[in-house]
């Protein structure tokens, strides 16, 4: 009877378990779970299509093929449920059990599991301490292994070849036991005592002398400990019986024509069963050992192929020559179980169609074709039809809908009301790629999209398609409306600025109506009110752009009215403005930037609702006025500057001059190339500037007859100036000159295209330009994939960074200051601290008042206070220093950028960070496509000019005065500052080695005065004293080559790498006596030359202090675009060591040079106190410090890029984070992309989660072990409580791939990469996945523990209060990122 009740049971709830454990299965476990042994390789009978008994599809083992019907047909239907048929042995139950019942195959001989054998490092090999090669020999019957040495003194598990085995037999007789194959290995594994081995290994580790031995022992100890703690037995890695997958998961489908399509697994299983049966028979017949061995080996290979085909030897191929898909392949990769079916599923109640623009829609609406709506809302329609009494049964409702009767459309209108749908455009790169709208029924078959949300979807209407999804349950509808409605997503989660901003036509229209025109109709009139302007405009008494004065009410404060100078167009625009927004916001020419600012200001002052209304009105007014303006462009709008020929002529002269210098041998080819490119880059800029000046100014005749220059209404200029379409770069190509083009290799072709598109290109110029443009297209295709992969890795590493508590109570934070480059402020401190939380009280430096109390969010008003107080540094809380154990606290994160207030609990900030960094990556890859391959490259900076006036101050600059009286800088970390009257430092510049300083200390200078100049393309080596040049070890053909230039016929001396390690090319300066000159005590005038240096002096020539004796050419610059950028971002996040990274000093101290060791230079840094540190620097690398220099910790001793791991080790986590944040930001900044720092910090935090154990103390940790920081801290606390010695660890920087793979959750790691490896390791450790991250919960089919899925939102109690006029309490907004 209870069976009947079970029938109506709900399926198992995915929520009633809290964790998942994975471990190695024992043979007993496999048999216990199995429903019977599969003995025959047969599948189904080809005539009756019924499964063969004991075969791979046997109904007795796996259950009936038809619901409640046994195989022979004796028992049919529900009434016999649960009976086992006595004839065919089949149980009468539903056929879906064929999806879950396992069978098994008993193997005639044990077989090794290939994952534990071949998945590196080999676990079986590690445990037994045998190399993989030897292990394979034993398993594949080519060698013997000692299973029990007894008292012969042989080592346990020693591997013998056939000959050695015969010898040992002769020597010891039968006093030892050895065997081959998996059975022997199983014996060995079974006889191992893990506790004894673990103790032995610990002793070995303490006694180990070499690092390599210690590491090897530690690895082995790890495996032993894993087995000990997990309760897995080592012999289970050898299989005695293998499970057989349920038949429905490896189906056999009859095709028409009597053939069958089958899963590859059936072939693989069949192979195993055949070989196993044959082996059983041979063993019964007592066949010769050779035959049996061969059959055993074949069985091992068959099982290997079943588990992981192709892992060992050649993959077994099916009849069509393609390798069969094994069980591992079913899990792995993009089309494996994890990524194809568990993380991304296809859903019903969805549709897709082409999109068209819907300019008359409101922001929260989208147009849904009637056909689609009818299909999507079917169940709701049926329900309504029945409710209204139009039909009585579902069947008749179905018929009615199919006939599309008029009532159906009425019902559809009703159903659709207030029921939001979700629109999604692939690729969904950030959360704004799916937004919710209220559907509006439309005719036609295309979905209509509101123009303002195109930016977020990155959609255009050239044939893009979008998908519609329908949220069904009430909860999902509420979430969709509250969190995903387009009207609730006005701000971008990446940078907190509005993303719903008018673009293109709308911008142009608003720009046109807010421009002012000199001497227009009605110029200078004065109006009494806004309405009066409107009347005058409608009566055509005043021009839209006339400059007039109007008396306006001050709506913001209700003060007395103001008279403002403005234009009728701006007054019209004011009509749609909310009262809270001041008129000054729009009383200017409204470009796209200004519009974005307007939406932002409106959001802050007037709130969400008003902003949405404003956005819609801006859309309408923008379209309206761009139509009225009727702006169009003609070829005459592309005005070519008159000075163009002169500029090009001048540039050509300069290029000739440089060519001559090169011919005379004054400069190298590299310098010549760089200088030529610089000249052309500058000329192109110059022409562009003149052209833009021309376009933006018109000359008109004023009423008094004078000619006046006024801003022009040139259409092309208006489009670019307003930001609606086109850029200065594109206009430059239309009317200036195209400029330099790039080769596909990224080098710049030195002959520029001097023509523009209006003049037309010659054949050669056209050819050069197609060269670069094609590269752009090819790149785009390739880079999109790379960028997608970067996003995937970022999401994976950050998916479990969730806001878990309000305040972690940390006392630590970051100090933030304005970001400057070359003395120029790139990002003001205000932009960097907005929306962050203050760490301590922020005080006014003058009055000492508290500007911002500690733990308070710094909002826009506070930022203004801080900036006006002139604070240069502010301490804020940061994700990096957050002490939350799991996740991040709200105070350390600060403002939720997309909502404009402090972040809510449960927000998935990690995923948002990953999307914010990944999304522009994909966008930027598309960027090259539009410029068309013109080389974009900044001319290098060669000099410094003062930006402010003041007095000069030298900071840490050593200089000598050369023969021309210039100060030449002789050290690297010098800085030059300009101090104003009050003694405040106005600007500060780092001065490079070898620069000429044009000013002297304490001199008063004016703005724009030259301070210093240098050659950006070479790095000079200068002499500090005068004297006579002598070469040392500069031997032609050994350490130096005379390179003859083919063009000029001149030779120059270049230092090359020598085979002789003792040869050290150097230039020595001798004094009059012929001795090496002393610079100062202990420092000689000896200069070592790195590989690649060009020697610029002759032997025995006389040099003065500050003269260049050799030059090291810098790289020729390539175009800087995001291609350089994306791999750079990936390199930073993967924490790769750069190719030639610089050795950095770990301490502060003074540099001296020691004796060379092993052909490397020895640099010694001596601190004021404590031990000196020695560094070896490879020969041929240029050492950038000099004897007697004072270096700071973290400073590079040689040329090269920084290695993030060194920065972490020497300067600590904060400096590393600062370095990573700044480097990543620089790449994006070059492209003009804004990303908030906190996103990059979130990713860096995830990269720094782990520590590496240096000393174990009294803890149970192992040396060199890598583990999560808080596990380490817990273990230390435990030991300290008992009075033991704690372990010592160093922070560890993991790249994002490594960090994702080393997460606690094995499910998440397995679904990311290296599935087999992750699962193998996890099963040996008996890992428990406590389902804390997002991915593992998605895979298990549960709600994610973020946003509304947080436990604290699940168990809310709703209490209805007595409504005695009490207003309900506001509910905290629930956010699900």
From Swiss-Prot:
Zn(2+) 2 binds at residues 808, 882, 889, 892. Its cofactor is Mg(2+); Zn(2+). Its EC number is 2.7.7.6. It catalyses: RNA(n) + a ribonucleoside 5'-triphosphate = RNA(n+1) + diphosphate. Keywords: DNA-directed RNA polymerase, Magnesium, Metal-binding, Nucleotidyltransferase, Transcription, Transferase, Zinc. Gene3D superfamilies: 1.10.132.30, 1.10.150.390, 1.10.1790.20, 1.10.40.90, 2.40.40.20, 2.40.50.100, RNA polymerase II, clamp domain, RNA polymerase Rpb1, domain 3. InterPro entries: DNA-dir_RpoC_beta_prime, DNA-dir_RpoC_beta_prime_bact, RNA_pol_asu, RNA_pol_N, RNA_pol_Rpb1_1, RNA_pol_Rpb1_3, RNA_pol_Rpb1_3_sf, RNA_pol_Rpb1_4. GO terms for cellular component: DNA-directed RNA polymerase complex. It holds the Pfam family RNA_pol_Rpb1_5. Binds 1 Mg(2+) ion per subunit. Binds 2 Zn(2+) ions per subunit. DNA-dependent RNA polymerase catalyzes the transcription of DNA into RNA using the four ribonucleoside triphosphates as substrates. Belongs to the RNA polymerase beta' chain family. The RNAP catalytic core consists of 2 alpha, 1 beta, 1 beta' and 1 omega subunit. When a sigma factor is associated with the core the holoenzyme is formed, which can initiate transcription. This is DNA-directed RNA polymerase subunit beta'. It comes from Geotalea uraniireducens (strain Rf4).
């Amino acid at each position: 009877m209870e069976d009947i009740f079970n029938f109506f049971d709900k399926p198992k709830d995915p929520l009633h378990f809290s964790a998942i454990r994975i471990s190695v299965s024992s043979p007993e476990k496999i048999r216990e779970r199995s429903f019977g042994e599969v003995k025959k390789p047969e599948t189904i009978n080809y005539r009756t299509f019924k499964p063969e008994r004991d075969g791979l599809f046997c109904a007795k083992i796996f259950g009936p093929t038809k619901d409640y019907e046994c195989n022979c047909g004796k028992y049919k239907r529900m009434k016999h449920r649960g009976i086992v048929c006595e004839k065919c042995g089949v149980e009468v139950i539903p056929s879906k059990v064929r999806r879950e019942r396992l069978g098994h195959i008993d193997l005639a001989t044990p077989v090794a599991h290939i994952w534990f054998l071949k998945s590196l490092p080999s676990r079986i090999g590690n445990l037994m301490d045998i190399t993989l090669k030897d292990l394979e020999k034993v398993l594949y019957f080519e060698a013997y292994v000692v299973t029990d040495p007894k008292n012969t003194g042989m080592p346990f598990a020693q591997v013998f070849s056939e000959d050695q085995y015969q010898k040992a037999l002769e020597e010891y007789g039968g006093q030892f036991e050895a065997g081959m194959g998996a059975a022997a290995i199983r014996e060995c594994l079974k006889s191992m005592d893990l506790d004894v081995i673990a103790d032995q290994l610990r002793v070995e580790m303490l006694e180990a002398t070499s690092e390599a031995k210690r590491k090897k022992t530690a690895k082995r100890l790890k495996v032993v400990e894993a087995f000990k703690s997990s309760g897995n037995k080592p012999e289970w890695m050898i299989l005695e019986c293998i499970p057989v997958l349920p038949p429905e998961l490896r189906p056999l489908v009859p095709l028409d024509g009597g053939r069958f399509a089958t899963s590859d697994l059936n072939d693989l299983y069949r192979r195993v069963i055949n070989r196993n049966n044959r082996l059983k028979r041979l063993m019964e017949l007592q066949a010769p050992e050779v035959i049996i061995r061969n059959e055993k080996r074949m069985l091992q290979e068959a099982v290997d192929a079943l588990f992981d085909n192709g892992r060992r030897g050649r993959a077994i191929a099916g009849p069509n020559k393609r390798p069969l898909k094994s069980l591992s392949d079913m899990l792995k990769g993009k089309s494996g179980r994890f990524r194809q079916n568990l993380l991304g599923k296809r859903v019903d109640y969805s549709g897709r169609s082409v999109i068209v623009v819907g300019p008359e829609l409101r922001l929260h609406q989208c147009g849904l074709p009637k056909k689609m709506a009818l299909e999507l809302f079917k169940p709701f329609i049926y329900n309504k039809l029945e409710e209204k009494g139009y039909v009585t049964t579902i069947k008749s409702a179905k018929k009615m809908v199919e006939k599309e009767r008029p009532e159906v459309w009425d019902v559809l209108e009703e159903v659709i009301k207030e029921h939001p749908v979700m629109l999604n455009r692939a690729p969904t790169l950030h959360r704004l790629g799916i937004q919710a709208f209220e559907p509006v029924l439309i005719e036609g078959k295309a979905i209509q999209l509101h123009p303002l949300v195109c930016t977020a979807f990155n959609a255009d209407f050239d044939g893009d398609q979008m998908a519609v999804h329908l949220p069904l349950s009430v909860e999902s509808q509420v979430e969709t409306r509250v969190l995903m409605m387009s009207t609730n997503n006005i701000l971008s989660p990446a940078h907190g600025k509005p993303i719903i901003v008018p673009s293109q036509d709308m911008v142009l229209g608003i720009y046109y109506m807010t421009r002012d025109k000199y001497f227009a109709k009605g110029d200078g009139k004065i109006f009494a009110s806004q309405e009066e302007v409107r009347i005058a405009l409608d009566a055509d008494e005043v021009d839209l752009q006339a400059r007039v004065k109007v008396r306006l009410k001050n709506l913001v404060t209700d003060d007395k009215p103001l008279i403002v100078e403005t234009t009728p167009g701006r007054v019209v625009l004011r009509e749609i403005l909310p009262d809270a927004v001041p008129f000054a916001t729009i009383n200017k020419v409204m470009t796209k930037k200004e519009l974005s600012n307007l939406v932002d200001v409106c959001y802050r002052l007037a709130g969400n609702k008003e902003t949405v209304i404003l956005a819609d009105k801006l859309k309408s007014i923008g379209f309206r006025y761009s139509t009225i303006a009727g702006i169009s462009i003609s070829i005459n709008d592309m005005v070519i500057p008159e000075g163009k020929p002169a500029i090009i002529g001048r540039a050509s002269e300069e290029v000739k001059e440089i060519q001559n210098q090169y011919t005379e041998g004054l400069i190298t080819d590299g310098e010549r190339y760089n200088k030529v490119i610089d000249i052309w880059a500058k000329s192109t800029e110059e022409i562009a500037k003149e052209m833009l000046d021309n376009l933006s100014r018109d000359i008109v005749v004023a009423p008094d007859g004078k000619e006046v220059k006024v801003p022009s209404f040139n259409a092309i200029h208006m489009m670019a100036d307003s930001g609606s379409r086109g850029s200065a770069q594109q206009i430059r190509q239309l009317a200036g000159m195209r400029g330099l083009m790039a080769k596909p290799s990224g080098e710049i072709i030195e002959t520029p295209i001097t023509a523009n598109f209006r003049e037309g290109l010659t054949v050669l110029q056209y050819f050069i330009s197609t060269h670069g443009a094609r590269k752009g297209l090819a790149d785009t295709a390739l880079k999109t994939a790379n960028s997608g992969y970067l996003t995937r890795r970022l999401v994976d590493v950050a998916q479990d960074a969730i806001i878990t508590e309000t305040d972690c109570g940390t006392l630590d934070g970051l100090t933030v200051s304005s970001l400057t480059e070359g003395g120029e402020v790139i990002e003001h401190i205000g932009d960097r601290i907005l929306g962050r939380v203050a760490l301590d009280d922020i005080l006014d430096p003058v009055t000492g008042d508290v500007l911002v109390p500690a733990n308070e969010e710094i909002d826009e008003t506070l930022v203004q206070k801080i900036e006006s107080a002139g604070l240069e540094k502010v301490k804020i809380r940061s994700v990096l220093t957050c002490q939350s154990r799991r996740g991040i606290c709200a105070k350390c994160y600060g403002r939720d950028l997309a909502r404009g207030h402090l972040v809510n609990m449960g927000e998935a900030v990690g995923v948002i960070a990953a999307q914010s960094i990944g999304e522009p990556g994909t966008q930027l890859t598309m960027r090259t496509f539009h410029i068309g391959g013109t080389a974009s490259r900044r001319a290098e900076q060669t000099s410094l000019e003062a930006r402010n006036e003041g007095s000069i101050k030298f900071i840490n600059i050593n200089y000598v005065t050369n023969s021309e009286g210039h100060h030449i800088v002789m050290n690297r970390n010098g800085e030059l500052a300009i101090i104003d009257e009050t003694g405040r430092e106005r600007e500060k510049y780092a001065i490079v080695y070898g620069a000429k300083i044009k000013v002297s200390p304490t001199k008063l200078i004016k703005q724009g005065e030259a301070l210093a100049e240098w050659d950006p393309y070479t790095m000079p080596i200068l002499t500090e004293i005068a004297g006579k040049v002598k070469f040392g070890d500069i031997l032609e053909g050994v350490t130096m080559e005379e390179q003859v230039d083919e063009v000029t016929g001149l030779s120059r001396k270049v230092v090359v790498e020598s085979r002789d390690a003792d040869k050290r090319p150097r230039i020595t300066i001798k004094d009059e006596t012929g001795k090496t000159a002393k610079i100062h005590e202990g420092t000689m005038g000896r200069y070592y030359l790195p590989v690649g240096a060009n020697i610029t002096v002759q032997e025995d020539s006389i040099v003065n202090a500050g003269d260049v004796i050799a030059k090291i050419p810098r790289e020729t610059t390539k175009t800087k675009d995001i291609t350089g950028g994306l791999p750079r971002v990936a390199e930073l996040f993967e924490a790769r060591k750069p190719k030639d990274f610089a050795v950095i000093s770990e301490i502060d101290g003074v540099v001296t040079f020691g004796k060379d060791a092993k052909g490397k230079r020895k640099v010694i840094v001596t601190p004021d106190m404590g031990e000196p540190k020695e560094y070896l620097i490879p020969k041929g690398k240029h050492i950038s410090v000099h004897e007697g220099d004072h270096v700071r910790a973290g400073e590079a001793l040689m040329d090269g890029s920084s290695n993030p791991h060194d920065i972490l080790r020497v300067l600590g986590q904060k400096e590393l984070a600062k370095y990573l944040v700044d480097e990543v930001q620089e790449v994006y900044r070059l492209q003009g992309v804004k990303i908030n720092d906190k996103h990059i910090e979130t990713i860096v935090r995830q990269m720094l989660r782990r520590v590496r154990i240096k000393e174990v103390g009294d803890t149970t940790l192992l040396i060199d072990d890598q583990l999560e920081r808080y596990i380490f801290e817990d273990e230390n606390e435990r030991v300290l409580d008992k009075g033991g010695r704690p372990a010592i660890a160093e922070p560890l920087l993991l790249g994002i791939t490594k960090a994702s793979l080393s997460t606690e959750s094995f499910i998440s790691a397995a679904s990311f990469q290296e599935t087999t490896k992750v699962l193998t390791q996890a099963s040996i450790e008996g890992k428990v996945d406590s389902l804390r991250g997002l991915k593992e919960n998605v895979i298990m089919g549960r709600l994610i523990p973020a946003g509304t899925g947080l436990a604290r939102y699940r168990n809310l109690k709703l209490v209805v209060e007595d409504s005695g006029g009490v207003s309900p309490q506001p509910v905290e907004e629930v956010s699900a990122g």
